[in-house]
């Protein structure tokens, strides 16, 4: 089974144009520990510190002696011939001080063995070239497919694998390099066997014409590092459109392969057989969000079947290959904990032209491990009619999983409200369980009834499990304690709180590995007879997060804090439990955990904490990724908007900057609005002042190297208390939040009031355009990346708005900056990927918004990035985005030229620019990813 891995450069996402983190449940389904295979104790994903634990991953300049602001001014537009024709030609590079940070070599990814005695160092390359994105791809049913490799397109990869032994004292042994695969191989889906003696992974090698090679399955001996293909036949390839392969025992894998008899792909008819017809003559109510990359006709459906259909085979180390089951569009293969059964999920026709494949008819079957059919668990119909109201779900059985503390017991949930969150009913969800093969016709057993929406289960044993429920509309969340196999013990509520109230979050239970390779809640043994578990929490406080580990008595609710992060200089978190090699309760005095440690100036490192002395042993020693910014200034600041709501932001200042000597700086404000139900929750502090300032490839923090002050993530709370809809006062609250942020940086003397720029990505781009329309006095210019600007083009809801355009017409219109294009007078830079795959943010949104701006003489510029989707990945694209952004900031923020009459420059500046050299913008096709992420795929 696949082990999870730590993406060490968490910075790449933390500040790289991400929204405000979602509010977490009080005792959310626990963090998945390192080495956790797919058989998890939890049945739903949880927000966590380890959002970068993955199993397949993407992919030095000296300090200036000049003051940062002076250095930036001196460089000015040195990299650019400001003649407009020059600014319209080809891909460009940003200033060297930005290039050096972006081109820094990426850190490896770590993966621990099941027994935690070895560590993989998975090596990565830097940013991919545009040629990788330019490879042909099919956009089918919400999935983007590389037809040559028969996998998801644009899939990142590893370039090498190193193995280190983890010694008892925490030191690492010498590296053993996995070898034997072809030079230049692209490695994906790296997983450990359950005994930790072997690795499995896919290998592909690009052809000479730059087309993708197909994926072959390889295995490697961990002791020797020697790798070899699993299949003797060179004609057997992986089909990794959905699931790829899984260990069923220590010497056998179940593999999704391309059917040997598949033949050539279907050819598109030169003449259509008839018109494209969709019908609703039964008058069904079908409301769907703006999905992308959908099937368009029968040819698309045939092509989807061609690429997505797999033949399952059992492959052993001795070369034996046994096909099992018929070819089908298999989406999930999941062995039971005792390895005797397989739970097989597949999708089938009739397909849909209005929803992605995650809503296609879905069949779940139970097979023996040898491929013999036992019974059908469910066959769900096409789900085009899931209501758009938040917390609405699909009808029928959902979240079907193996119970991790039993050899072969299933559990699932069924809605009682027809999946419609607007229907009032009690109970709303019922959780069931039953044996894989029921005896004498026994019926499924009711495990628990819920009045809110089911949100997951954490299993421990026959006497303990935690069941979670939540309701987004009220932000209410509950955690129940149940005894799964003891009918005489009544369920009870352990926690009942608001998911917005991060200060009261008690943390998540830590998991331990069982002998079956599954993960369950870890029980800890003290001297008494009480039942203790470990709660791992982020420890939100008014001064910032102070993570903790509590020893929690599940019966009395009493707790003892046995570990807590340093508050003064460092930010530390608990990453995983390391002392789980044997079954049963863990003695507290033998506890061993993995922690991370970082500071404002020190990169994240990993440590072992060993009880009873709580000895700390450092495992890694990664260098600072951008030493030229090592002495930057970082501060979490608090301020207040005029209605009394407390706001927070992180202020960054360039190295060497002294406000008393250098004066106010140009400032870039980068943010993303969030919805709240209460003012108190909106004002709570999230994050830590001691976190390492990670800088991703498109992060606004890059402009610290250009002498800018950066106000990162100022809270923009859109509050709707009680029955009030937050978005009915969106513009008002957006403006007052931005006013408070701008006034605060000016009050502190670090930002010049006439040189404050604003920017954002996706919903942050939507925010940026609205601020330039409704608060032009605050900002000199704006940068809006991959946004949606006309909400009438997303009529069945967007973001967290679940009313339709016809139910909230005024709100849709007033929120749309497209409708206020005539009010935008400050310079605005629009950037969008030509192939945006995000729901709602079609490339057309930026194209039409630009035309509206141009039609009113607004100083504007549109950059369409060939082959890029919602986030940008190719080096050429990223460097050009940074060049465009730097040019915009230097010209309209640093120089203050945005005060120029926009009408006088409109005819020259409002040009459409393609990153390839001035081509017309291309409307992005619609896209939506499959509902569940592949194993081991970032």
Swiss-Prot record:
Subcellular location, record wording: Plastid, Chloroplast stroma
Region (Disordered), start-end ranges: 58-77, 897-938
One GO term (biological process): proteolysis
A Pfam family of this chain: Peptidase_S9
Domain of life: Eukaryota
Enzyme Commission number(s) of this protein: 3.4.21.-
InterPro entries assigned: AB_hydrolase_fold (IPR029058), Peptidase_S9_cat (IPR001375)
A cellular-component GO term for this protein: chloroplast stroma
Keyword set includes Plastid: yes
Record's keyword terms, sorted: Chloroplast, Hydrolase, Plastid, Protease, Serine protease, Transit peptide
Transit peptide start-stop: 1-54
Biased composition (Low complexity): 58-76
Active site: 762, 836, 870
Compositional bias ranges of the Polar residues kind: 897-913
Protein family membership: Belongs to the peptidase S9D family.
Function: Serine-type protease active in vitro against the LHCII N-terminal. Cleaves its substrate on the carboxy-side of Glu residues.
Descriptive protein name: Probable glutamyl endopeptidase, chloroplastic
Native organism: Oryza sativa subsp. japonica
């Amino acid at each position: 089974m696949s082990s999870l891995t730590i993406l060490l450069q968490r910075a790449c996402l933390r500040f790289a144009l991400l929204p405000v983190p979602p509010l977490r449940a009080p005792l959310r389904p626990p963090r998945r520990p390192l080495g956790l295979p797919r058989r998890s104790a939890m049945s739903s994903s949880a927000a966590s510190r380890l959002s970068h634990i993955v199993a397949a991953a993407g992919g030095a300049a000296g300090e200036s002696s000049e003051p940062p602001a002076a250095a930036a001014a001196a460089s000015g537009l040195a990299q650019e011939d400001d003649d407009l024709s020059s600014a319209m030609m080809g891909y460009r590079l940003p200033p060297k001080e930005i290039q050096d940070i972006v081109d820094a070599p990426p850190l490896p990814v770590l993966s621990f063995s099941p027994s935690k005695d070895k560590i993989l160092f998975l090596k990565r390359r830097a940013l991919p070239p545009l040629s990788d994105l330019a490879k042909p791809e099919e956009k089918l049913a919400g999935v983007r497919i590389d037809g040559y490799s028969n996998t998801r397109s644009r899939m990142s990869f590893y370039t090498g694998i190193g193995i280190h032994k983890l010694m008892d004292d925490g030191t690492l042994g010498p590296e053993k390099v996995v070898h034997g695969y072809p030079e230049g191989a692209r490695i994906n889906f790296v997983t450990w066997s359950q005994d930790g003696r072997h690795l499995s992974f896919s290998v592909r090698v690009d052809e000479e014409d730059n087309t993708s090679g197909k994926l072959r399955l390889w295995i490697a001996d961990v002791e020797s590092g020697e790798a070899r293909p699993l299949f003797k036949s060179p004609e057997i390839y992986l089909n990794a459109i959905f699931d790829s392969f899984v260990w069923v025992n220590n010497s056998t894998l179940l593999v999704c392969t391309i059917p040997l008899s598949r033949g050539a792909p279907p050819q598109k008819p030169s003449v259509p057989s008839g018109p494209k017809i969709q019908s609703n003559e039964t008058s069904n109510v079908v409301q769907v969000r703006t999905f992308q990359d959908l099937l368009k006709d029968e040819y698309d459906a045939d092509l989807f079947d061609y690429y997505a259909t797999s033949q399952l085979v059992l492959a052993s180390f001795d070369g034996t290959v046994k096909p099992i089951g018929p070819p089908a569009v298999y989406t999930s293969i999941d062995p039971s904990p005792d390895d005797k059964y397989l739970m097989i999920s597949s999708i089938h026709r009739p397909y849909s032209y209005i929803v992605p494949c995650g809503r296609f008819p879905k069949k779940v079957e139970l097979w023996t491990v040898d491929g013999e059919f036992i019974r059908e668990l469910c066959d769900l119909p096409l789900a085009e009619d899931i209501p758009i109201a938040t917390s609405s779900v699909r009808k029928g059985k959902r979240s079907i999983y193996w119970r991790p503390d039993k050899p072969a017991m299933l559990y699932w949930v069924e809605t009682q409200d027809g999946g419609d969150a607007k229907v009032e009913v009690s109970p709303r969800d019922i959780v069931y369980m039953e044996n894989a093969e029921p005896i004498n016709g026994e019926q499924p057993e009711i495990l628990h009834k819920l009045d809110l929406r089911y949100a997951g289960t954490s299993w421990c044993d026959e006497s303990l499990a935690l069941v979670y429920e939540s309701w987004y509309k009220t932000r209410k969340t509950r955690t129940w304690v149940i005894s799964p196999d003891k009918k005489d013990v009544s369920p009870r509520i352990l926690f009942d709180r608001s998911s917005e109230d991060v200060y009261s979050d008690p943390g998540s239970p830590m998991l331990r590995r069982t002998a079956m390779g599954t993960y369950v809640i870890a029980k800890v043994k003290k001297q008494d007879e009480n039942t203790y578990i470990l709660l791992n929490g982020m420890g939100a406080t008014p001064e910032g997060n102070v993570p903790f580990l509590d020893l929690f008595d599940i019966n009395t609710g009493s707790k003892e804090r046995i570990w807590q992060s340093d508050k003064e200089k460092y930010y530390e978190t608990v990453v995983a439990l390391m002392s789980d090699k044997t079954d049963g309760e863990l003695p507290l005095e033998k506890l061993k955990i993995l922690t991370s440690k970082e500071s404002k100036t020190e990169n994240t490192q990993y440590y072992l904490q060993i009880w009873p002395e709580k000895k700390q042993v450092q495992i890694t020693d990664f260098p600072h990724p951008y030493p030229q910014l090592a002495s930057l200034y970082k501060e979490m600041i608090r301020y207040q908007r005029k209605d009394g709501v407390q706001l927070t932001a992180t202020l960054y200042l360039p190295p060497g900057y002294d406000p008393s000597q250098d004066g106010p700086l140009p400032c870039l404000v980068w943010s993303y609005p969030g919805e709240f139900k209460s003012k108190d929750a909106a004002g709570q502090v999230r994050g830590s002042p001691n976190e390492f300032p990670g800088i991703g490839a498109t992060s606004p923090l890059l402009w610290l190297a250009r002498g800018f002050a950066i106000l990162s993530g100022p809270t923009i709370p859109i509050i709707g208390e009680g029955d009030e809809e937050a978005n009915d006062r969106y513009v008002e609250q957006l403006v007052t939040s931005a006013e408070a942020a701008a006034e605060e940086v000016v009050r502190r003397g670090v930002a010049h009031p006439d040189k404050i720029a604003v920017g954002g990505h996706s919903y942050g781009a939507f925010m940026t355009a609205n601020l330039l329309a409704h608060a032009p006095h605050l900002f000199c210019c704006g940068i809006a990346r991959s946004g949606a600007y006309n909400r009438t083009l997303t009529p069945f809801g967007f973001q967290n708005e679940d009313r339709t355009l016809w139910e909230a017409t005024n709100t849709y219109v007033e929120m749309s900056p497209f409708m206020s294009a005539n009010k935008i007078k400050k310079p605005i830079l629009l950037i969008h990927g030509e192939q945006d795959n995000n729901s709602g943010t079609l490339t057309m949104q930026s194209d039409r918004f630009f035309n509206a701006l141009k039609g009113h003489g607004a100083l504007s510029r549109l950059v369409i990035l060939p082959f890029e989707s919602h986030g940008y990945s190719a080096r050429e694209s990223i460097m050009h985005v940074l060049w465009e952004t730097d040019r915009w900031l230097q010209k309209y923020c640093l120089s203050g030229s945005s005060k120029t009459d926009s009408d006088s420059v409109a005819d020259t500046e409002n040009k459409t620019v393609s990153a390839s050299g001035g081509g017309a913008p291309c409307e992005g096709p619609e896209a939506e990813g499959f509902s569940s992420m592949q194993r081991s795929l970032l």
